[in-house]
Amino acid sequence: MDFSFSFMQGIMGNTIQQPPQLIDSANIRQEDAFDNNSDIAEDGGQTPYEATLQQGFQYPATTEDLPPLTNGYPSSISVYETQTKYQSYNQYPNGSANGFGAVRNFSPTDYYHSEIPNTRPHEILEKPSPPQPPPPPSVPQTVIPKKTGSPEIKLKITKTIQNGRELFESSLCGDLLNEVQASEHTKSKHESRKEKRKKSNKHDSSRSEERKSHKIPKLEPEEQNRPNERVDTVSEKPREEPVLKEEAPVQPILSSVPTTEVSTGVKFQVGDLVWSKVGTYPWWPCMVSSDPQLEVHTKINTRGAREYHVQFFSNQPERAWVHEKRVREYKGHKQYEELLAEATKQASNHSEKQKIRKPRPQRERAQWDIGIAHAEKALKMTREERIEQYTFIYIDKQPEEALSQAKKSVASKTEVKKTRRPRSVLNTQPEQTNAGEVASSLSSTEIRRHSQRRHTSAEEEEPPPVKIAWKTAAARKSLPASITMHKGSLDLQKCNMSPVVKIEQVFALQNATGDGKFIDQFVYSTKGIGNKTEISVRGQDRLIISTPNQRNEKPTQSVSSPEATSGSTGSVEKKQQRRSIRTRSESEKSTEVVPKKKIKKEQVETVPQATVKTGLQKGASEISDSCKPLKKRSRASTDVEMTSSAYRDTSDSDSRGLSDLQVGFGKQVDSPSATADADVSDVQSMDSSLSRRGTGMSKKDTVCQICESSGDSLIPCEGECCKHFHLECLGLASLPDSKFICMECKTGQHPCFSCKVSGKDVKRCSVGACGKFYHEACVRKFPTAIFESKGFRCPQHCCSACSMEKDIHKASKGRMMRCLRCPVAYHSGDACIAAGSMLVSSYILICSNHSKRSSNSSAVNVGFCFVCARGLIVQDHSDPMFSSYAYKSHYLLNESNRAELMKLPMIPSSSASKKKCEKGGRLLCCESCPASFHPECLSIEMPEGCWNCNDCKAGKKLHYKQIVWVKLGNYRWWPAEICNPRSVPLNIQGLKHDLGDFPVFFFGSHDYYWVHQGRVFPYVEGDKSFAEGQTSINKTFKKALEEAAKRFQELKAQRESKEALEIEKNSRKPPPYKHIKANKVIGKVQIQVADLSEIPRCNCKPADENPCGLESECLNRMLQYECHPQVCPAGDRCQNQCFTKRLYPDAEIIKTERRGWGLRTKRSIKKGEFVNEYVGELIDEEECRLRIKRAHENSVTNFYMLTVTKDRIIDAGPKGNYSRFMNHSCNPNCETQKWTVNGDVRVGLFALCDIPAGMELTFNYNLDCLGNGRTECHCGADNCSGFLGVRPKSACASTNEEKAKNAKLKQKRRKIKTEPKQMHEDYCFQCGDGGELVMCDKKDCPKAYHLLCLNLTQPPYGKWECPWHQCDECSSAAVSFCEFCPHSFCKDHEKGALVPSALEGRLCCSEHDPMAPVSPEYWSKIKCKWESQDHGEEVKE
């Protein structure tokens, strides 16, 4: 029974789009390639082919002398028929790697038959050919096709037939005619290129005629009258060739069923893995594939060299023709170094070698790593599996769509085009499968033309080729968020997901619009796989096309895959690229069909400068909680690399984070196609809306408080609320003449932002631009609220997620995203924002607390207790928050095997104790999350009514990039990862979801679905133990557990690395504080100011050497009074004004080894000299206790409070000067003194001794210990007490302690007798001889051996036991020993192995005679050494 976990068919989707351009390595010259335009025939010599011509053959004067036959068959025989799935293709090949593509000179058929005419087998004629049309007027003599790309067809490759037989059997027949005619061509390459430039206008018009002449389908009359417009797609109905005036007739395109190539010299076949070198890009892993137009994988180019058609492994599906000398067999990623070494040897100079060895850019490296990951996976497959798994499937546009889009781009370069999209749902038929629409977009840099081409007539310019971008979930995850954002886009934008429509509806809509205005919204693509027909819908809402006027204008994005840059300056022959779709997965092969549910219709607005095509991907369906059985649904097969770090985390460390908003728009991205890959998601998807907004937005958001939407016509209230409103929301027709003040500000009845109750007893937040009002009782309920002397800072200025970590500094700094409806704020990043929040603007959101749960979306609780759960971890119930239980291990209970699983013991954590709890019992279930508890485990009684767990009460939320367990429908709890909405496929974004829902990526099945917090609980390390040893767990679930564990470790490593970087960054500078110069009064404390008459006057004279100095007899200095400049007789010369003048010696903040930050002097300080004043906030005792309490709650351990008097305390924590960094010491070099300065008491620090420069400044804190807790002191002084707040030891106490310590060392000793200890034998136990022996390390074993007897060359390493302790038969522990040799036996082998001997009955083995087990010489050899310990050894009593 298959329990594979899959939630929707094709949700991941294999649909990708071909990038808009191919590699065209025209600038890559192959030195050894054969050039038929510069061979020896130009010098008058004979070509190699001329020597092989049969005697009597004469070249025809014109092509009219040749019969209209090709390869011996009439032209009407369909020998080369386009495959069904390529029927919508135009017949233009993709060009060659040498820059001389067939499209420049030939039609595809002529090119194909001229280069490799032997690749199509001859067919037997079954019916005569119809009569040929009459030949048109004669044409000039045929000349060889040149690289100038002449538009006229000057050559027809045919085979001469004589008497119904081919005149030549050589496969080079098509080339012979070319080579002979090439010998007559005398123009140089430079002249032909010059002629090409002169005739460029003529080329454009004639090229369109040439292309029309080669089209099989019958065009509509209105299209036949437009010879200068390009026709890009082939329709299904053939037509007769129209005869164009003044143009040579062209034979119809011959078609045949595709066959394998049989030409010689082919080294690689379709499905082979190779390395290819294109341009300046590194060697890239590729797979040989068949060209979608020529249907061959190799060909001979115009220079006579072989080329292979390859498709590149990357997240950009690209392909190209590559020269055979630039292709190597792929044997593994380690081969890359060999290729570099080979290229380095071939380099001509040192600079080229350095260029080869230069490290690749990070953007290109990421793409290369993805390609290597694909190639390594493909290397393990067979050729057939690789072809099935990796071959591209190409889909093209209808000609009307390309033409209509091109017309729009030419008519209006900046005007926004809007097109409404029909909404309908396709009912799947048994023999048909929906094809997911490939999301496509258009970039202004991608659709530029390489030159300003104009026709000779005064008609419009030829529309440029329309590029179709591509999108997969894997590639989208590697794109930086700056791609999906647009500066200046301020409107809220919604995502419109186009459903798959019925074929009948498509044709009905197509026929209903005769003017072609609606036809560009549909794309038909028929895959030649069985009877499955794929029909997808594509719509276009906004389009801004900017066509640069200069040829040398550079694009704003760079490229990191090899195909994206070649041909970017493009030529006339740039062709429209095909969107590519990876081959169908295993799920597509299933004949079972999943019924579809209708998807809610939504409007869509796309971003300027990018057209975002949205649609459901292959087989996507929305499923409810009651999912279908797994065996009835086919699972979308996605690459395993989706779960690997190479695939999921190619971009920045936090690629899905909202912090990507800070990325500038001028930065480079991975590929040009990525520019068009702008993700569009529902407005309810918070991050996707944010991803479309740039850094150019104003910092202050403007959102209407009534309709909760942004806009430009918002009126600000001039009152205290700082709110904005729409005129229409206020019911006003025009702006008021005077300042606008809302009704709340007029009446003073502001509602509390927490409880929403209005009244005049509310208080405003102290932050000026906030404008929120609260009841004091309401705001005190939030731990993130900060109370100050002048009021409070509301919770919207502190991150709710960071506050859970008890880091108040981290929580209160940084950019915040605030909830519009409640006092909740988060930092703008995946690590903080609650999953399921909805973005309103760049700094305003609606958090997930406001989700409206329906009756069927309640929480699904687990069937076990989160605390005990059969041996789970017991919490410390003394913590009231009880916040860590959700991160402990859990049972995973399935409906079918719950009873069986409950019998199995859990694997307890080594760091926690077990709680014995009886089986079953009542469970207390949380209403908001799946948590369940036994009431006795929480030490509470069973409450009545609804109950929420402590985590939910505290506001703890799930975050993006978090591994969780998810319960969906009837399936078991499954490991998944919470995804940022903008990182999931577009069809997943379009699924119905509400506020509070977030997408999850299921491991193992690689499916997506929207869930809410009630069905999710966190995954913790070790959860995979639940599945070990269970026979009922299928392969998919085991794979999911492995992937979840791997991903969990990756995220854990990323988080630890980020934290380490943050710690390292914070260690570079001290913690933040506000530097002040004088004390700041807080609360009721006041600063005393004395009258001049009350200030004492000293007796110092101005004529003294140092008036009022350190060594003077200044009366004020002795009484610790500072002189006043208007009272002191010394006047300005007074040296007792250090506090007022702030005469501090130079000092610097330093980082100490164990005591944090410290202060060090830069110059020498004399004893008694003023060092600094201790300044900060002056608070009273009540405020001091509140701050200490708050510090303990937030785990703050550093205090800066210094008591001046009972009601005057200086707190230098939030504000202060350099004195706050002075550390404590039990033997300090500074002391605090209270001085009276202008009538107020202030604290100064003075030197206790002479302090040299470079020494740290310290003073004794003299702390009073609160409670039993003590802080360890690390001052390192000799008299250190060991703890802060404990008095240092005096000299007398230190002397007494030293004497007591020495007295303990003088212990009484007595002599004891010891038993003699037997040492090892001094002879070998094997042979009985002495010498250099190896002794056994086993306790009480005296045996020793020669190395030679042990068959060893050197002594064994470490602890060694001799062979006597191992059984001779099985090498297990021996229990019976032969006492005359090393033979021994275990319990299983001791029977009959040993017998008593005549020598005192000692056991001996079969190698000894029981009557005389040893020889007489044995006793003369034995010398046993007995040693004993010294009897005079002293031991401690």
Curated annotation (Swiss-Prot):
Query: What does the UniProt keyword field contain?
Result: Acetylation, Chromatin regulator, Chromosomal rearrangement, Chromosome, Coiled coil, Isopeptide bond, Metal-binding, Methyltransferase, Nucleus, Phosphoprotein, Proto-oncogene, Repeat, S-adenosyl-L-methionine, Transcription, Transcription regulation, Transferase, Ubl conjugation, Zinc, Zinc-finger
- Which residues are reported to carry the modification Phosphoserine? 150, 457, 585, 587, 590, 655
This protein's GO CC annotations: chromatin; nucleoplasm; nucleus
SET domain location, by residue?
1145-1262
Q: Which domain of life is it from?
A: Eukaryota
| Main function | Histone methyltransferase. Preferentially dimethylates 'Lys-4' and 'Lys-27' of histone H3 forming H3K4me2 and H3K27me2. H3 'Lys-4' methylation represents a specific tag for epigenetic transcriptional activation, while 'Lys-27' is a mark for transcriptional repression.
Q: What is known of its domains?
A: The KIKL motif recognizes and binds the NET domain of BRD3.
Q: What is the protein named?
A: Histone-lysine N-methyltransferase NSD3
Taxonomic placement? Eukaryota, Metazoa, Chordata, Craniata, Vertebrata
What's the gene? NSD3
